[in-house]
A protein has these predicted regions:
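C-terminal lobe/tail of nucleotide-utilizing enzymes
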Residues: 1-27, 190-266
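Residue-level signature of catalytic and energy-coupling elements of molecular machines
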Residues: 36, 47, 73, 81, ...
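Walker A/P-loop phosphate-binding motif and the immediately C-terminal alpha-helix
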Residues: 38-75, 190, 203
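Phosphate-binding loop that captures ATP/GTP phosphates
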Residues: 68-123, 130, 217
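Conserved nucleotide-binding/hydrolysis micro-motifs of P-loop NTPases
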Residues: 76-78, 114-116, 154-155, 178-182, ...
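Phosphate-binding/switch loop-helix module in NTP-utilizing enzymes
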Residues: 115-166
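Conserved Switch II/interswitch segment of TRAFAC-class P-loop GTPases
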Residues: 143-147, 156, 168-189
Length: 266
């Protein structure tokens, strides 16, 4: 329910109360995150293209390069970052603001770290998910960081929209795969970001066979950016991720692939 103050001030400022509340929340989020130098989203409208793989390895690559890094799992419905890191540790929710967990040198926060059973589905309507995201941003204390890498949910509806509206992002890394259907959805993602005034920093082709495909080149062209990296299809790296090991920490080839991406978005 809108506060009496918001209801009174809405007409005075010529704004709907809900819009006024969004502006106020954005100001509170900005204040909370003021110690973070760069906030970068990893995004695609298509699920299953490897957003979390890219987000996790990019975060740990930046940490390995000597930067202070946070990793935010912003996928409320399917928060997979803790599984990729092989941790079931929980954040302390008895005190606010919440403190991210240090997982191998990177500060990590995820809704999977605040619910009793992360394996149970979260069945919420879009508006409630958007509110949860706003509350999560507003009530998590990251401290001072060089980079916050944000693993976005797929789609172009409430969740990614809320993130684009509430966070002052440097921009997005778009993730796609060689398949045409992934490219079509990645283009949707990039155009949505640009329409909302958020930069597209570059395109990454995951599960690549080597040279970027024509479909991936189409994504870069349609969004006015460049292909900044290709991640090779490698069964061994997939097995590492399944066992909670971060390839960028343990495999020099993987690290160098992600380092090339990191150098392009710094």
């Amino acid at each position: 329910m809108e506060s009496a103050e918001a209801q009174q001030e809405g007409p005075k400022h010529g704004m709907h109360p809900s819009f006024l509340n969004t502006i106020r929340q954005k100001e509170r989020v900005k204040e909370r995150l003021k110690g973070i130098r760069q906030k970068i989203g990893v995004y695609s409208a298509k699920g299953g293209v490897g957003k979390t793989t890219v987000a996790v390895n990019l975060a740990y690559t930046l940490a390995r390069m000597g930067y202070s890094v946070g990793l935010l799992d912003a996928d409320i419905d399917c928060p997979n970052v803790p599984m990729f890191l092989g941790t079931d540790a929980k954040m302390d929710i008895s005190h606010f603001p919440l403190k991210p967990l240090d997982v191998r040198g990177v500060k990590v926060a995820s809704t999977a770290m605040v619910v009793d059973d992360a394996k149970k589905p979260i069945i919420w309507r879009g508006a409630l998910v958007a509110k949860m995201l706003g509350d999560f941003f507003e009530n998590t204390d990251w401290g001072e960081l060089d980079y916050l890498i944000i693993d976005l949910p797929p789609g172009t509806s409430d969740s990614p929209l809320s993130i684009m509206q509430l966070l002052d992002l440097k921009g997005f890394v778009l993730v796609t795969t060689p398949q045409r259907i992934a490219a079509v959805n990645s283009i949707r993602s990039g155009l949505m970001a640009k329409r909302l005034g958020v930069a597209v920093l570059g395109v990454v082709e995951n599960m690549s066979a080597g040279e970027p495909t024509a479909s991936t080149k189409d994504v870069a062209a349609a969004t006015g950016t460049e292909i900044i990296g290709t991640i090779m299809m490698d069964k061994r790296l997939g097995e590492m991720a399944d066992s909670g090991r971060v390839p960028a920490l343990e495999d020099d080839k993987a690290y160098n692939e992600f380092k090339r991406i990191a150098e392009r978005i710094k």
